[in-house]
């Protein structure tokens, strides 16, 4: 068993994120890895649990990845976006607050923005991470 308090995990600021071969700005976002376990055969974790903090107005732009993820909103309010995988057009926009769980399947383009006046937080559980470059 591995036990750790989230404040004891190193907080890393995220500035850029790749999508379709281009780097996109990530605004006001930091991440703490709470756990990383397993090996997908390429030296990367198969499972991870992360803690995100996004400042007011901060956002994670459109992106996708091989792994599945489930986010659980702890505080603040987010506008969550789903995009068409072929055209990148916005197909769904949902406001999510504390207690909301959001599942993103593998390779589904998505993003989010903190629309509250306070730092917003969520946990993000990921499975089957295949490419370190694609993990936020």
Where are each of the predicted segments found?
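A short, N-terminal "cap"/entry segment at the start of jelly-roll beta-barrel domains
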Residues: 1-46, 94
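Double-stranded beta-helix
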Residues: 2-10, 85-88, 109-136
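Conserved hydrophobic/aromatic beta-strand scaffold that supports enzyme active sites
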Residues: 31-33, 49-53, 70, 93, ...
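Conserved short histidine dyad/triad with adjacent acidic residue
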Residues: 33-37, 48-65, 106
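Short, conserved beta-strand element in jelly-roll/cupin
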Residues: 51-55, 65-80, 84, 125-127
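Short beta-strand His + acidic residue motifs that chelate non-heme Fe in jelly-roll/DSBH
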Residues: 60-63, 80-82, 104, 110-116
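Short acidic-glycine-tyrosine-enriched beta hairpin
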Residues: 85-106
